[in-house]
Amino acid sequence: MLAKRIVPCLDVREGKVVKGVQFRNHEIVGDIVPLAARYAEEGADELVFYDITASAHDRVIDKSWVSRVAEQIDIPFCVAGGIKTIEQAREKLAFGADKISINSPALSDPSLISRLQDEFGRQCIVIGIDSFYDAVSDSYKVKQFTGDEAATKDTQWYTQDWVEEVQKRGCGEIVLNVMNQDGVRGGYDIKQLSIVRAICDVPLIASGGAGTMEHFKAVFELAKVDAALAASVFHKGIIDIGELKQYLHANNIAIRL
C-alpha cells in the first residue's frame, strides 16, 4: 500500500503567505521560505504553493521565491498561479518545482492540460478544482478565479464532470478544494470527496476543512484519498505534523514517519 501524504498548503499573495476563510478575508501568516523550511523539517511529505491572485490579475508566479524554496527544502513541492503556457511551466520546473498545478487557466483553455502532459509527462501535472456546494440545486459546481473575491465567477462545469474531463486530458493528480469547508476547521467534506473518489483514477488530494487529527484519519479511512492538504491548522500551530503522523501511524494509516 502506498503511504498517505500530508501536504501543507501555502497561499501566497504579494510575496507573503496568507490564509483566508472560505476563500475570503485573507490575513498575512508569514514569510514563504522560513515557513516552507519549517514544514519540511517537521516531516511534511510535500508542499503546495498557490499564488492566489496570479490568474485573476493575469500574471504568473514570481520565480524568485520558487528558486529560494528549492534551495532550502529537500521534499517535493508544487507551484500554482497563472501558468498558461508550456514556457511558463518549463521555467517553474527549471527553477526547482517538482510539479506544476493549474486551475483557472485549465478552465479557460482545457487543451492546456494535454499540452502540458505531452511536454512534461502527467506525473508533474496537477489540476486544482475549486468546488462549491450549491444547496439550492443540491449540486457541486466549479468556480474560477477564486483567489480574488471580486474576480471569482461561476463556470459551466459541475464538479464531477470536470473531474472526468481533466483525467481524459491527461492530468496526473487532482486537488479538490472544497470551498464551503475552507478555513473553518470543521472536517473534510467526506461525502463530496467520496463521490469524486469513485470517478477519480489518479491520486486525489483532499483540501478544505482540517481542524483535528481525527479529521485526517477520517478522510483517509472514509474517502480513501491519497493525500490530505491543510493550511490553517499548521500555520497556527494547532497541529504538529510529526505528532499527526505518529497519531495516524498508531491508527493503522500507512504514513511515512
Curated annotation (Swiss-Prot):
Reaction equation(s) it catalyzes: 5-[(5-phospho-1-deoxy-D-ribulos-1-ylimino)methylamino]-1-(5-phospho-beta-D-ribosyl)imidazole-4-carboxamide + L-glutamine = D-erythro-1-(imidazol-4-yl)glycerol 3-phosphate + 5-amino-1-(5-phospho-beta-D-ribosyl)imidazole-4-carboxamide + L-glutamate + H(+)
Pathway membership, UniProt: Amino-acid biosynthesis; L-histidine biosynthesis; L-histidine from 5-phospho-alpha-D-ribose 1-diphosphate: step 5/9
Classification via Gene3D superfamilies: Aldolase class I
Name of the protein: Imidazole glycerol phosphate synthase subunit HisF
A Pfam family this chain is assigned to: His_biosynth
Family, per entry: Belongs to the HisA/HisF family.
Name of the encoding gene: hisF
Subunit structure: Heterodimer of HisH and HisF.
Biological function: IGPS catalyzes the conversion of PRFAR and glutamine to IGP, AICAR and glutamate. The HisF subunit catalyzes the cyclization activity that produces IGP and AICAR from PRFAR using the ammonia provided by the HisH subunit.
Stored CDD domains: HisF
InterPro entries on file: Aldolase_TIM, His_biosynth, HisF, IGPS_HisA/HisF, RibuloseP-bd_barrel
Main location: cytoplasm
EC number(s) per entry: 4.3.2.10
GO cellular component: cytoplasm
Superkingdom classification of source: Bacteria
Subcellular localization(s) per the UniProt record: Cytoplasm
Claim: Amino-acid biosynthesis is one of the keywords in the record: yes
Keywords associated with the record: Amino-acid biosynthesis, Cytoplasm, Histidine biosynthesis, Lyase
Biological processes per GO annotation: L-histidine biosynthetic process
Active site per the UniProt annotation: 11, 130
Entry keyword annotation includes Chaperone: no
GO molecular-function term, one example from the UniProt record: lyase activity
